[in-house]
């Protein structure tokens, strides 16, 4: 039974990752209204007409439905056969976040909402993926969340502060997409050919996100340097901080590629999905470090 639970946990994490990526595609392709103002039907049908926008939106809905069924099965088996309280917490939070984002998605179709609320939809998807990833890790060698070395309070503060700040940066990125402000800054690293552009409208929104992303990179770089200096002998802390730096570096690069590809619609959609997927991985590694700091208190 343990192997079945592990497989379902892995499928859940993969499914949540796919939902997050497809949600980013829905936003980038402006397909959120691809099924009109109907839910769960799409233009009055279970199988909609084969337009691009309806196909993207309906595929996203279908994947959410299938993954939700997998989560329910995983939830039952974890509470029935797994004794670890952290596993029960992770699957509970995954299910809760998935249900909330599904409800928000349905409401967004029926009653159009502000960009501030729509951006939160991606944030909830990110949390759902992070919890599902932690659940999957429970059944691996990384799932024994006790670090090999005591962690200083300063490092713990840096980990948690960086993780919370990363969520804010991700929210700003989602807000950029939902306000269709991406074109506010043409070119990278300069914005409209300027180091500091006129901070109005879409340009101000995009430039704020860029500065926030730069500060996030510096925070994770500081996290990595501290881990290398003090915790290189701890495989788990070293693993999490190293991959957090790798993914935030890829995030910066992919953000630049998204800007450069704005003239090509296909490339723009593809790079936007890649950017969202890298963001999810980065946040997942930061959450893993947070769990290590929590369990250090019990060591």
Q: Where in the sequence are the language-model features?
A:
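Polytopic transmembrane helical bundles with strong interfacial aromatic enrichment
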Residues: 1-299
């Amino acid at each position: 039974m343990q192997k079945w639970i592990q497989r379902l946990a892995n499928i859940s994490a993969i499914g949540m990752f796919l939902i997050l990526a497809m949600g980013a595609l829905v936003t980038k392709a402006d397909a959120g209204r691809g099924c009109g103002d109907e839910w769960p039907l799409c233009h009055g049908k279970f199988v909609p007409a084969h337009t691009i926008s309806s196909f993207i939106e309906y595929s996203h809905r279908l994947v959410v439905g299938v993954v939700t069924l997998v989560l329910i099965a995983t939830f039952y088996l974890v509470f029935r056969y797994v004794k670890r309280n952290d596993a029960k917490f992770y699957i509970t939070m995954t299910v809760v976040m998935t249900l909330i984002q599904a409800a928000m998605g349905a409401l967004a179709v029926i009653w159009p909402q502000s960009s501030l609320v729509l951006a939160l939809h991606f944030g909830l998807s990110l949390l759902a993926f992070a919890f599902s990833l932690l659940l999957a890790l429970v059944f691996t060698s990384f799932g024994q969340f006790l670090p090999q070395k005591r962690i200083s309070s300063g490092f713990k503060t840096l980990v948690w502060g960086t993780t919370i700040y990363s969520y804010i940066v991700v929210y700003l990125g989602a807000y950029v997409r939902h306000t269709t402000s991406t074109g506010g800054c043409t070119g990278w690293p300069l914005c409209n050919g300027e180091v500091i552009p006129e901070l109005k409208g879409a340009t101000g929104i995009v430039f704020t996100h860029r500065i926030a992303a730069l500060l996030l990179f510096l925070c994770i770089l500081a996290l990595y340097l501290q881990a290398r200096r003090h915790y290189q002998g701890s495989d788990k802390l070293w693993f999490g901080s190293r991959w957090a730096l790798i993914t935030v570096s890829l995030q910066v690069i992919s953000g630049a590629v998204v800007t450069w590809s704005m003239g090509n619609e296909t490339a723009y959609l593809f790079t936007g999905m890649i950017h969202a997927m890298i963001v999810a991985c980065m946040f997942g590694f930061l959450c893993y470090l947070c769990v290590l700091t929590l369990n250090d208190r019990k060591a």
